[in-house]
């Protein structure tokens, strides 16, 4: 089905003279589009482009370029590496295309955001050419099997490598500014965070973890997502006093442990485990009893009784959600 936008006059598109948004115009090329020379942002998301218009090479003021959700392959993106006029580019989005390798972005010496997620990339080889100015790197939903060539990216704040084929957490030592690490849907068995003390959000959902050990030094951690693993014991959490969200659903837990000190905990996901006792949960969450607003416990033995929801509401006076039940 064609987008209604196809019928709109292209010369009227855009928010201003320096922002051009051509999202979802089903364009096969930019032949009918005027590209103002002073563009700062060019958004070509959700079109049918299989190549790059050579006029983009002259946009010397461009800061943001999005080619998300097109048909760009390795040969089509190659000219970018020679377009020196674009050296001030700060954000490059190549998400959801047909890339098989990491493009050469070495000329973008001020790059802050780089997104190559949802492609067919098998290796991070070539990422070493990316500028050390980079703050956000997104490589999710590819086929990468090793964390490599990223040690120089010491300004990284967000690293997204979810839905790949990673087995080992490695080469993270230099990321002293990293705040978010997303590694869900990989094949990781052991947590190795190399003492990332500034990190605030970690996702290791849907991996092969059997232990929670490895987070002890991440004292700034606020959100921890560990669902769909094989964890049988809650441990190594007592020092994580800033934790607000803890998701350990869909594991092999029989009890709730090591969270008594977590006075800031607001969201606790324990559903789909083997937890027997509500009384034990009461004792385990003493520190956050007043703070907790959301708790998931369904599909545990302790959630089978008919008065289970009422009992949980008594334990947590300020709770707003129990499983799918919302309370005003």
Curated annotation (Swiss-Prot):
> What are the GO MF terms of this UniProt record?
protein phosphatase inhibitor activity
Ranges: LRR repeats: 13-36, 37-59, 61-82, 86-110, 111-130, 131-153, 154-177, 179-196, 197-221, 223-240, 241-264, 266-287, 289-312
Print the keywords alphabetically.
Leucine-rich repeat, Protein phosphatase inhibitor, Repeat
A GO cellular component entry from the record: nucleus
Task: Identify the InterPro entries for this entry.
Answer: Leu-rich_rpt, Leu-rich_rpt_4, Leu-rich_rpt_typical-subtyp, LRR_dom_sf
Q: Which Pfam families match?
A: LRR_4
Mind listing the GO biological process terms from this record? abscisic acid-activated signaling pathway; protein localization to nucleus
Q: Where is the signal peptide?
A: none
Subunit structure, interactors included: Interacts with human protein phosphatase PPP1C.
Q: What does this protein do?
A: Inhibitor of protein-phosphatase 1 (PP1). Binds to and inhibits PP1 activity.
Q: What is this protein called?
A: Protein phosphatase 1 regulatory inhibitor subunit PPP1R7 homolog
Q: Which source organism does the UniProt entry give?
A: Arabidopsis thaliana (Mouse-ear cress)
